[in-house]
Amino acid sequence: MPTWFEDWLQAEGEAQSLRIWSPTLIPGLLQTADYARALFLAEQTDISDDAIDALVAARLERQTILDRADPPDVVVVLDEMVLHRLIGSPQMMHDALVNVAELSRRPYVVVQVIPVSNGANAGLGGAFYIAAADGMPETLQMVGVEDQTTEKRSLVRKAAVAFDRVRGDALPRDASRDLILKVADDKWKS
């Protein structure tokens, strides 16, 4: 496991709040096992089924922070194209989107969607995650060609401003959930 990701896992595990911007995929904390498996199969070349199983298990283990006694406050903003991008099969997409909608019913999980009709937004440069906890510097994970985790204040601040802007462009929580379920049923339901 790369050092940058180990750093992120520690920050994520200790976080009291997480802000996530994802313009291309359902973020790992909200993925189903089938969705994660389809992603890993698409991303990895020449990897065994056992290795894929281990990656999926690790992804699902990360999600246990949402079930702890004092879970972090999680705010996720998705680009609407995430809802329309086929990962795996149509049934997998349906199930993945219903899962996101159900998780968003938890009081500490907010999922908002930026409609494609909004056009360009402040987050089109790539996905990022910001973890915060009392007594610790905020940690930023930037996802892209060269993934990295950093506590560099200028980068964290820049990402926080971008997050506030994309969140401001997004539909409210309930309207976002309605859109997620509409796409799940209208586009992906078998």
Where are the model-predicted features located?
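C-terminal regulatory/effector modules of DNA-binding transcriptional regulators
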Residues: 89-190
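Interdomain hinge/linker segments and adjacent boundary elements that couple functional modules
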Residues: 1-84, 134, 150-190
